Design a protein with these regions (language model features):
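Short, flexible helix-loop junctions that flank or precede catalytic/ligand sites
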Residues: 1-351
């Protein structure tokens, strides 16, 4: 069925998601014992017990039916209530065994040219399932495959998704560590990286002030850092980064954020006219001139000011949406919905 996600839940049949449509792929409902035993097989004998204790599980699972085939999944297991009893839902997200090539992602030329900074931070943002990890994996593959790359690449992920075993790397080496299996947190991962002389650090998600702060420190000391963030837009990304810190630190941190930022990409996957999904991107490449412009911003105006800079120097989401609508790749309904969201966000900045 070309499924991207598979869901097992106590008291329900098996569901699969294919191009945004949820499909029932079995008639029989699963018992709690079946779901628990499946989780224990994937995670270990204490998997279901951990769920019952109120702690969810994020991990990966790999299945090899033979030497030539390999299937990988990102797995989340969470406790839930079904008919008044404790139950479990397991979500499997399929991961291609080989990272994609950047040439397969139809990235814009100005963006491609900016994705290998010598130092500073590249933020890839968007909702869950918007292709952030896929884009980062393509960037890493592209850099690692270069004959003269000479990069020690360290990744810290929760869980590890794409692997690079099948990629020819003439002059680079990749080490992937899983949080919390190998290190307790993303922030600990960044601190670990600084002791290993890397030429590229990937931080799976900047979800807290400690991780964001550690990534900034790594960038300030001359390292290129790539990370993801859950935000909706370039302007929203800067606002979220600044607001993640206590109010008394916000002004100083805003300066550090702007000094270290190199690229922000906001990506969405939307329905395409061929029944599949297509990536739309908003992005801004922060050169020295743009960083100087934003350093003059007042703290409370950073989001609105960034949006003005984006319109003049970057690619707003509305521009990419219009391009793909004119090319017949997305429907008028999808296009109008995206434009409406953009107008609402801009109105919010003006309030």
């Amino acid at each position: 069925v070309g499924a991207s996600d598979i869901t097992l839940q106590t008291g329900e049949p098996v569901f699969a998601e294919s191009y945004g449509r949820l499909l029932r792929i079995t008639q029989r409902k699963l018992s709690n014992t079946e779901v628990s035993e499946t989780l224990n097989l994937i995670y270990g004998p204490n998997g279901s017990a951990q769920i019952l204790s109120g702690v969810d599980i994020d991990t990966h699972y790999e299945f090899r039916p033979n030497r030539n085939e390999r299937y990988r999944f990102r797995v989340n297991a969470t406790g839930c209530l079904v008919e008044g009893h404790d139950a479990i839902q397991i979500s499997f997200r399929t991961i291609p065994s080989t990272p994609p090539k950047m040439s397969d992602l139809n990235l814009e030329t100005p963006l491609i040219d900016a994705l290998a900074p010598e130092q500073g931070i590249v933020y890839v943002t968007g909702a869950t399932g918007s292709g952030k990890t896929t884009l980062l994996a393509a960037i890493i593959r592209d850099l690692a495959e270069k004959e003269d790359s000479h990069r020690k690449i360290l990744t810290y992920e929760a869980p590890i998704e794409f692997v690079y075993d099948s990629i020819a790397m003439p002059s680079s080496i990749i080490s992937q560590s899983e949080i919390p299996r190998h290190l307790p947190s993303f922030a600990a991962g960044v601190r670990n990286a600084l002791r290993r002389k890397p030429r590229l650090i990937l931080v799976g998600e900047s979800r807290d002030p400690e991780t964001i702060g550690a990534s900034i420190e790594a960038a300030l000391t001359g390292h290129p850092v790539y990370t993801t963030l859950h935000s909706n837009g370039v302007a929203e990304t800067l606002r979220r980064l600044v607001n993640s810190f206590p109010a008394e630190e916000a002004k100083t941190r805003m300066i550090d954020i702007i000094e270290t930022i190199r690229v922000v990409i906001w990506q969405q996957l939307v329905p395409s006219t061929d029944g599949q999904r297509i990536a739309l991107r908003e992005f801004l490449v922060f050169d020295e001139k743009l960083r100087d412009i934003l350093l003059d911003s007042k703290l409370e105006n950073i989001s609105a000011h960034t949006r003005l800079v984006l319109k003049k120097y970057g690619q707003p989401m509305s521009v990419d949406a219009k391009r793909k609508f004119n090319a017949g790749l997305i429907s008028e309904r999808v296009y109008k919905r995206l434009i409406l969201r953009t107008e609402i966000a801009e109105h919010h900045d003006e309030i």
